Amino acid sequence: MKPDVHIIGAGLIGLSTADSLLDRGERVVIWDRAPAPGMGASFSNGSLLHPSQAAPWIVDGLSEDLDEATRDELTANGLELAARSGDRVTRRISELGLPARKLGVMQVFNTSEARDARLEAYARMGTLAEPSDWFGHSAINIPGDSMADARAYSARLAEDLAERGAEFRMCADVGLAESGRGLVITCGAERETVGRIVVAAGNATAKLIKGLGLDLPVMGVAGHALSFLRNDDLADLPAVMHADSRSAMTVLGREVRLSGTVGLDSPGDLLPIWRELVPDLIEELGQPRRAWTGHRPCTPDGRPIMGPTPIDGLYVNTGHAHMGWTLCAGAGELVAEDVVAGRAHTPSRDAEMVPAR
């Protein structure tokens, strides 16, 4: 009998990896440092499923050095994985009995020139995009993007995994080591030797495997959110992305959520951005009921790191940045396929595992 597959990380990426492994007949044990699944970057993000945003982010100034051909290649790869992921997550949303995706996302710009330039970029990507207007701002309607509650999905998916036989072990100091017998998961003084491990612990992945001699170019970039109680007249508010600040406004059940990452020091920094865009709407929302900060796992070139490592039996699935919800189901499938096939790391994949990638 094959040994269980142990997954460290119970966020969207780890849960989705477990989901695909169970589909393939594997037994799964899921570890996390939080007291419950989905408590990290999956907890309060903008919940946008947005393949249109597959272009690599500029992180730590390094992505600016990518030439146009490389950026186009990375964008195409992201779009391909997003398409695969979208098909699966749509099916799983239905199977899990969750509300269907809310189709269509509006993207607003500070100037019409910026809007027109983005329309040209979307045309090159093959992304359907229509010029529009939102509260007097130049905008683009993106019919292929959508919204669904990422937190609700992770909670329901975790329940489903448990019902199908997955075992959850919550340990505040879960760690990873090596012994003469193989890989070892530690929890306090307890040690368990395991045969196959997927580390999908977001930005903590790099720290977890560093003791094994592996350096991953993964850094945590703070993401912030403010949640407001929604008035009834805002039920039909569309999901909106603000291009210049890379922030978003979404309606999730009885909440309106502002979320964003780049250039923000705290959740409160979201308010002046959206107060300038839609002052009357922000005034109507009143005081936020909850503020949240999490850390998205980002890589310098915007490309996630997925698959086998040079250590036999050790796999990683991380670095999805702002695309974690959009890519989780497809990324989980890809890594599950690697694990089931027992694929080994090869020299051609070394670039996936070193900071100079």
Model-predicted segments: where are they?
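N-terminal Rossmann-like FAD-binding beta1-loop-alpha1 element of flavoenzymes
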Residues: 3-30
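Conserved Rossmann-like nucleotide-cofactor binding loop
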Residues: 13, 36, 204
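Glycine-rich FAD pyrophosphate-binding loop
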Residues: 23-43
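Active-site substrate-recognition segment that forms the wall
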Residues: 41, 45-53, 57-68, 76, ...
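Rossmann-like flavin
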Residues: 66-160
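Helical element adjacent to the flavin cofactor pocket in flavoenzyme catalytic cores
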Residues: 135, 139-188, 192
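C-terminal catalytic lobe of FAD-dependent flavoproteins
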Residues: 144, 150, 244, 280-357
